[in-house]
């Protein structure tokens, strides 16, 4: 495919050390690339070099002539003196921009709830972020670079954005570079994943699920990779393969290999044992919301109404809802910081509740202390999976380096503060744990470690998040706040999205517009679909036979006289031919599978 943008032998270093050393990467027509890695390893820096915002100390960035590159970084670039409308479409007359289906789609999908004439200076940080993203998407770009675009978006907005990107930067059309900690979004959008680590950029085929599979295979083969990190990713892979087998488009030949890889991985959670422990710690009564409604002083509108929810011991519940729907108010009722206007909240006598909020205000009091001093005041050990861990070991498990223990709390990055905050909450030994947007300021490795920690936590868990991957991973049931009411979602997040679409259609609200730039592909007939399925089955059988032949060829190589270089060369050539046949069949399998989607 045609080259669009790239970097050749890029080198960048700061006084604190080398960030990238001789890195070569490229973006071709149709690439949708997700960039992952630990916070601080250089993801945003890489994006800055490729978009021209940061100049490398050595190497060069190449661009196709006339290439249009748009980027969204994490700085606020809006002019507070402008209105929302000006920030989005400038001085273009309304009849001009309103007649553009793409502009209507972007405005409806991201900022329909923000008045066009509102001054930017009156907006919240989340609203300003959405305006920035919408203004970028309204423009015309060949390559677009997005740094954490899902920040401040609710689940509907994230789902809309994924659909918009896939339609607009489709296969063989333009290029996308994406940094995100939202693993569902990454898996939905990316066709290639770059992992930034140890001053290099390592490419992987596919989205997040395929990246996890390949990373596990890499880690198993590389003896230098630490066992702890490998086990975490194998556990993550186990959930991906058991809980959502459609997440990766690998053919059955590869899926069988993945299943063999995780055959000895135990279930993520022993739900029976965790429920028993939770009941022992909590008793049968936890928190009951009985016919609860909340209206704030001076307002006739009820934020929540007629809420009836009995929270049981050991339940793991996810809460979803649009921004402003009342999720924080619901958490306030559970925590006791919000008083209901009517109804009552009944709390069990043994309940010890801790909440991980978005402010991390509890760290302000210890801002001048070193991390080791803070954890030195805590209990000496914490048990996970039957093992006793010290607070320092627990922090390491959450991605803290030992040399960071001497850092003062006030000097920690946002992600480091989040790690420390989570550890302090867990070590306070609550039996009811509430997590309010726990994915803010953390990378995918930290999220995986957090999920691993929560797997062995035996209390009642309530999670409010726009990160559907996290919700589906750590909770067993989901509820939504819709029109001020709490509704159970037996079908999970997908059911919530269907309900919001139905409500938008029935009320005629300014919901995300239907994209009309391209006509949908014509549906295939039943006979054509059967022919595709038949060919896929044939390929599966051929791949299975080739796998046996490849295994046999490896055995022949191992048993052959190692001094017979001619014979070894012949066997190796035969092996390469078999592997080439596998690659061709897998490529055809992928083409056919897309026809069935």
Describe the predicted segments one by one.
Residues 268-270:
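Flexible, solvent-exposed coil segments and beta strand-coil junctions
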Residues 1-224, 278-597:
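ABC ATP-binding cassette signature C-motif
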Residues 236-245, 273-279, 287-288:
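Alpha-helical coupling/stalk and coiled-coil linker elements that connect catalytic or binding modules
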Residues 214-257, 261-265:
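Intracellular alpha-helical coupling/juxtamembrane segments of multi-pass membrane proteins
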